[in-house]
Amino acid sequence: MDLNTINSMSYEQFLDTFGNIIERCPLVTAAIWSQQPFASVTELENRVFDFIESLPLAGKEGILRCHPDLAGRDLMRGTLTDESQNEQAQAGLTLLSAKEKETLGFLNLQYKAKFGFPFVICAKMSDKNKIMQELGSRLQNEQSEELQKGIAEVKKICHLRICDLFLNEKLPTKL
Protein backbone atom coordinates (compact mmCIF):
# COMPACT_ATOMS: atom_id res chain seq x y z
CA MET A 1 0.00 0.00 0.00
CA ASP A 2 1.36 3.41 -0.89
CA LEU A 3 0.62 6.97 0.18
CA ASN A 4 -1.28 7.83 -3.02
CA THR A 5 -3.64 4.95 -2.37
CA ILE A 6 -4.22 6.13 1.20
CA ASN A 7 -4.82 9.73 0.17
CA SER A 8 -7.39 8.72 -2.45
CA MET A 9 -9.42 6.48 -0.12
CA SER A 10 -13.04 7.23 0.58
CA TYR A 11 -14.03 7.60 4.22
CA GLU A 12 -15.35 4.02 4.27
CA GLN A 13 -12.18 2.61 2.71
CA PHE A 14 -10.00 4.57 5.12
CA LEU A 15 -12.01 3.38 8.11
CA ASP A 16 -11.95 -0.22 6.87
CA THR A 17 -8.18 -0.06 6.43
CA PHE A 18 -7.11 1.94 9.49
CA GLY A 19 -10.06 1.45 11.83
CA ASN A 20 -8.13 -0.70 14.30
CA ILE A 21 -4.76 1.04 14.43
CA ILE A 22 -5.95 2.07 17.88
CA GLU A 23 -7.51 -1.05 19.39
CA ARG A 24 -11.30 -1.09 18.97
CA CYS A 25 -11.34 2.69 18.64
CA PRO A 26 -12.26 3.63 15.07
CA LEU A 27 -13.22 7.12 16.26
CA VAL A 28 -9.56 8.11 16.03
CA THR A 29 -9.37 6.96 12.42
CA ALA A 30 -12.66 8.66 11.61
CA ALA A 31 -11.37 11.92 13.07
CA ILE A 32 -8.14 12.02 11.07
CA TRP A 33 -9.62 11.01 7.69
CA SER A 34 -10.58 14.62 6.96
CA GLN A 35 -6.95 15.69 7.43
CA GLN A 36 -5.92 14.07 4.14
CA PRO A 37 -3.77 14.32 2.15
CA PHE A 38 -0.92 13.04 4.26
CA ALA A 39 2.56 13.94 3.03
CA SER A 40 4.10 10.86 4.63
CA VAL A 41 3.40 7.87 6.80
CA THR A 42 4.97 9.82 9.65
CA GLU A 43 2.49 12.64 9.15
CA LEU A 44 -0.45 10.23 9.28
CA GLU A 45 0.95 8.72 12.47
CA ASN A 46 1.56 12.15 14.00
CA ARG A 47 -2.03 13.16 13.26
CA VAL A 48 -3.22 10.08 15.16
CA PHE A 49 -0.92 10.87 18.07
CA ASP A 50 -1.92 14.55 18.10
CA PHE A 51 -5.58 13.55 18.21
CA ILE A 52 -4.95 11.24 21.16
CA GLU A 53 -2.95 13.90 23.00
CA SER A 54 -5.74 16.45 22.47
CA LEU A 55 -8.25 14.24 24.26
CA PRO A 56 -9.29 15.06 27.80
CA LEU A 57 -8.38 12.64 30.58
CA ALA A 58 -11.63 10.69 30.16
CA GLY A 59 -10.94 10.23 26.43
CA LYS A 60 -7.46 8.87 27.05
CA GLU A 61 -8.81 6.52 29.71
CA GLY A 62 -11.46 5.45 27.19
CA ILE A 63 -8.80 4.54 24.65
CA LEU A 64 -7.08 2.38 27.26
CA ARG A 65 -10.40 0.75 28.20
CA CYS A 66 -10.84 -0.38 24.58
CA HIS A 67 -7.86 -2.71 25.02
CA PRO A 68 -8.46 -6.30 26.11
CA ASP A 69 -6.86 -7.90 29.14
CA LEU A 70 -3.69 -9.69 28.08
CA ALA A 71 -4.33 -13.45 27.93
CA GLY A 72 -7.80 -12.68 29.25
CA ARG A 73 -11.40 -13.50 28.48
CA ASP A 74 -11.30 -12.33 24.86
CA LEU A 75 -8.30 -14.52 24.09
CA MET A 76 -9.99 -17.53 25.70
CA ARG A 77 -13.26 -16.89 23.83
CA GLY A 78 -11.55 -16.20 20.52
CA THR A 79 -13.04 -12.70 20.33
CA LEU A 80 -9.81 -10.69 20.08
CA THR A 81 -9.26 -8.55 17.03
CA ASP A 82 -6.97 -10.19 14.49
CA GLU A 83 -4.25 -7.72 15.37
CA SER A 84 -4.45 -8.43 19.11
CA GLN A 85 -4.60 -12.17 18.52
CA ASN A 86 -1.39 -12.03 16.49
CA GLU A 87 0.37 -9.69 18.92
CA GLN A 88 -0.52 -11.75 21.98
CA ALA A 89 0.49 -14.97 20.21
CA GLN A 90 3.82 -13.46 19.23
CA ALA A 91 4.46 -12.56 22.89
CA GLY A 92 3.73 -16.15 23.94
CA LEU A 93 0.47 -15.31 25.71
CA THR A 94 -1.46 -18.03 23.86
CA LEU A 95 0.83 -20.70 25.31
CA LEU A 96 0.75 -19.88 29.02
CA SER A 97 0.80 -22.62 31.63
CA ALA A 98 -2.12 -22.83 34.05
CA LYS A 99 0.00 -21.14 36.73
CA GLU A 100 1.02 -18.33 34.37
CA LYS A 101 -2.62 -17.76 33.37
CA GLU A 102 -3.60 -17.59 37.02
CA THR A 103 -0.80 -15.15 37.85
CA LEU A 104 -1.50 -12.91 34.87
CA GLY A 105 -5.24 -12.99 35.58
CA PHE A 106 -4.65 -11.96 39.19
CA LEU A 107 -2.31 -9.13 38.18
CA ASN A 108 -4.78 -7.94 35.52
CA LEU A 109 -7.55 -7.78 38.15
CA GLN A 110 -5.36 -5.84 40.57
CA TYR A 111 -4.34 -3.42 37.86
CA LYS A 112 -7.90 -2.74 36.68
CA ALA A 113 -9.09 -2.30 40.25
CA LYS A 114 -6.38 0.26 40.93
CA PHE A 115 -6.42 2.24 37.69
CA GLY A 116 -9.87 1.68 36.16
CA PHE A 117 -8.55 0.49 32.80
CA PRO A 118 -6.66 -2.59 31.60
CA PHE A 119 -2.89 -2.91 31.53
CA VAL A 120 -1.61 -1.97 28.08
CA ILE A 121 1.80 -2.93 26.75
CA CYS A 122 3.04 -3.41 23.21
CA ALA A 123 2.97 -7.21 23.27
CA LYS A 124 4.63 -7.40 19.86
CA MET A 125 7.76 -5.85 21.38
CA SER A 126 7.72 -8.04 24.46
CA ASP A 127 7.32 -11.58 25.73
CA LYS A 128 5.27 -13.22 28.47
CA ASN A 129 7.98 -12.92 31.13
CA LYS A 130 8.64 -9.25 30.46
CA ILE A 131 4.88 -8.56 30.36
CA MET A 132 4.28 -10.13 33.78
CA GLN A 133 7.31 -8.37 35.23
CA GLU A 134 6.21 -5.01 33.80
CA LEU A 135 2.63 -5.50 34.99
CA GLY A 136 3.80 -6.18 38.53
CA SER A 137 6.13 -3.19 38.43
CA ARG A 138 3.58 -0.77 36.98
CA LEU A 139 1.11 -1.63 39.73
CA GLN A 140 3.31 0.57 41.93
CA ASN A 141 2.77 3.65 39.76
CA GLU A 142 0.48 6.59 40.43
CA GLN A 143 -2.64 7.03 38.28
CA SER A 144 -1.24 9.91 36.21
CA GLU A 145 2.04 8.11 35.49
CA GLU A 146 0.22 4.95 34.49
CA LEU A 147 -2.10 6.84 32.17
CA GLN A 148 0.96 8.31 30.42
CA LYS A 149 2.67 4.92 30.20
CA GLY A 150 -0.49 3.28 28.86
CA ILE A 151 -0.91 5.93 26.16
CA ALA A 152 2.78 5.61 25.24
CA GLU A 153 2.22 1.85 24.76
CA VAL A 154 -0.90 2.54 22.65
CA LYS A 155 1.28 4.71 20.41
CA LYS A 156 3.86 1.92 20.02
CA ILE A 157 1.10 -0.52 19.08
CA CYS A 158 -0.34 2.00 16.63
CA HIS A 159 3.06 2.64 15.05
CA LEU A 160 3.63 -1.05 14.41
CA ARG A 161 0.12 -1.51 13.02
CA ILE A 162 0.54 1.42 10.63
CA CYS A 163 3.93 0.06 9.53
CA ASP A 164 2.37 -3.34 8.91
CA LEU A 165 -0.31 -1.76 6.73
CA PHE A 166 2.05 0.43 4.72
CA LEU A 167 4.99 -1.87 4.40
CA ASN A 168 3.02 -5.11 4.21
CA GLU A 169 6.10 -6.92 5.43
CA LYS A 170 7.36 -8.44 8.62
CA LEU A 171 8.83 -5.83 10.95
CA PRO A 172 11.33 -6.16 13.77
CA THR A 173 9.44 -7.11 16.90
CA LYS A 174 11.93 -5.82 19.43
CA LEU A 175 13.16 -2.23 19.38
Swiss-Prot record:
Subcellular compartments: Peroxisome
GO terms of biological process kind: allantoin metabolic process; purine nucleobase metabolic process; urate catabolic process
EC category name: lyase
EC number in record: 4.1.1.97
Matches recorded under InterPro entries: OHCU_decarboxylase (IPR018020), OHCU_decarboxylase-1 (IPR017580), OHCU_decarboxylase_sf (IPR036778)
Keywords: Decarboxylase, Lyase, Peroxisome, Purine metabolism
Active site: 67
GO molecular function: 2-oxo-4-hydroxy-4-carboxy-5-ureidoimidazoline decarboxylase activity
Reactions catalysed, as given in the entry: 5-hydroxy-2-oxo-4-ureido-2,5-dihydro-1H-imidazole-5-carboxylate + H(+) = (S)-allantoin + CO2
GO cellular component: peroxisome
Family: Belongs to the OHCU decarboxylase family.
Functional note: Catalyzes the stereoselective decarboxylation of 2-oxo-4-hydroxy-4-carboxy-5-ureidoimidazoline (OHCU) to (S)-allantoin.
Designated name of the protein: 2-oxo-4-hydroxy-4-carboxy-5-ureidoimidazoline decarboxylase
Species assigned in the record: Xenopus laevis
Recorded name of the encoding gene: urad
